Structure formats: C-alpha cells, structure tokens
C-alpha cells in the first residue's frame, strides 16, 4: 500500500496472511476489476486487522472494505474450500468472549455478493481440535470461525465505511489441526515457519496432515480469489 494519501475513494481488500492474498495479487494485473482494489495484508489477529483498517482510513477515503481470508468450519456442511459471505459477524474476542457482539455488513454489498451466506465468529486464538470447534458452534451457531474480521469491521463501522466479509474454509469441524499453531506463533502472533518445520521434524507422523492442510489452504485461497473476481467484476464503477 502506498504511503501517499489518496483523495479517490478506494475499494480496499484486507487479508490476514500472504498465503490468502497471493492468488488475488497474481490476478490483479490481468483483471481490471481487481486492479482497482487496494490490497492490504494485516497479519494474524483482530488487533492487527483493526490497525490495518485504521491505516487505510488514514491514507484516504474508502468506498468499501472487503475483509477476507481463511476460516475454520464449524458445521458439517462446511468442508475445505467452502465459502461463506457473512450475514453477521460475531465478535467473541477478549471481553466479548462469553457474550459476542454482533456486527452486520452493508446490505447493498451483501446483496451484490452472490454466494452462500452464514454467520462468522471471530475469536482470539486458533481452534485446533474438533471439541473446541463444536463447543464454539454450540455457543454461537456460527458456520465458520476466523481471527480478524471483527477487529477490522469494528473500525470500519465507527468510520461509517460499508463492509463485507468473505471466508474460505481450510478445515472442517471434525478435522483436528496437525499442531497447536498457537504454540508455534512468534511474539507478533504470526505462525513461525521455522517452528512449524521443527515441529514436523520432531513429529514426522503428522507430516501428512500438515501437507493436507496446505492443500486445503491452497484450495481455499483459489476459491476465494475466484469468488472475489466474479463479485468485483459486477461492482459498480
């Protein structure tokens, strides 16, 4: 993102991770509808997403904000690669953990985004076991979980910026993650690749599950870009 302030309202697309954004960025040069978007990779977690959104606002007017990336499935209907367009975002981070705060996207943006809808809940850590995911669904009835959306959209709402959230699943509700990625994060909360490699080397029987998660993540990123491309090509100029 350029450091110079813009006077032209921008369509801003916020990802958390480089892996989420990579297919979108590769398509930007070839697809004018994507080329007009300002893309930001915030880093993992609601606080980083909130700070990145505040920085976008400081850089100039925003026409709309699309918060997107990976999520975890909380129901049997959500399989790796599945998408949801969030009808509601439940903030279950920090003090809202027991009584989530509810945010709703811009109605016009939601209507333009032709895709499967559902509720998305934002939490403060990676859910690594089926039990954790099942318990969160029982408490919130959400279809998918992430770690960023609530932070970004809270800032957007305060500024009066219309927003939309789209998530693609990397894991199903009954699928445990190969490692506790919370324990493999660095001081900034981002997954440390070196720690992941060491964990794989010391737990080689988990390598197939790690490879499978990588394949699911690649599928989710591809499906997410395909959806965003179709959606943004119909966006009004």
Task: Please tell me what each predicted stretch does.
Residues 6-12:
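Extreme N-terminal starter segment of soluble prokaryotic enzymes
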Residues 20-23:
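Short, charged/polar "capping" segments at the starts of alpha-helices
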Residues 12-14, 66:
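Conserved beta-strand elements of the Class I
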Residues 26-237:
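Glycine-rich phosphate- or other oxyanion-binding loops that anchor nucleotides, phosphorylated ligands
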Residues 14-16, 40:
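Short hydrophobic segments within beta-strands
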Residues 4-5, 92:
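Absolute N-terminal positional cue centered near the fourth residue
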Residues 17-18, 149:
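Helix N-cap/beta->alpha junction signal
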Residues 1-3, 14:
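Protease-domain processing segments flanking chymotrypsin-fold serine proteases, especially trypsin-like
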């Amino acid at each position: 993102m350029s450091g110079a302030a813009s006077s032209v309202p921008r369509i801003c697309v916020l990802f958390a991770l480089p892996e989420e954004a990579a297919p979108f960025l590769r398509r930007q040069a070839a697809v004018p509808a994507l080329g007009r978007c300002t893309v930001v990779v915030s880093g993992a977690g609601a606080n980083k997403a909130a700070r990145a959104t505040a920085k976008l606002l400081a850089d100039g007017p925003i026409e709309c904000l699309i918060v997107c990336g990976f999520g975890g499935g909380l129901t049997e209907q959500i399989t790796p690669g599945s998408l949801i367009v969030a009808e509601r975002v439940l903030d279950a981070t920090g003090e809202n953990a027991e009584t989530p705060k509810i945010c709703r996207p811009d109605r016009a943006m939601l209507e333009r985004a032709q895709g499967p809808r559902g509720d998305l809940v934002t939490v403060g850590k990676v859910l690594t076991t089926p039990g954790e995911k099942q318990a969160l669904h029982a408490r919130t009835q959400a279809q998918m979980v992430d770690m960023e959306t609530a932070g970004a959209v809270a800032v957007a709402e305060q500024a009066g910026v219309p927003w939309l959230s789209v998530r693609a699943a990397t894991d199903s509700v009954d699928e445990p993650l190969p490692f506790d990625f919370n324990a493999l994060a660095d001081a900034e909360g981002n997954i440390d690749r070196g720690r992941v490699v060491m964990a794989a080397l010391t737990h080689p029987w988990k390598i197939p599950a790690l490879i499978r998660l990588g394949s699911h993540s690649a599928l989710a990123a591809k499906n997410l870009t395909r959806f965003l491309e179709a959606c943004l090509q119909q966006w009004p100029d």
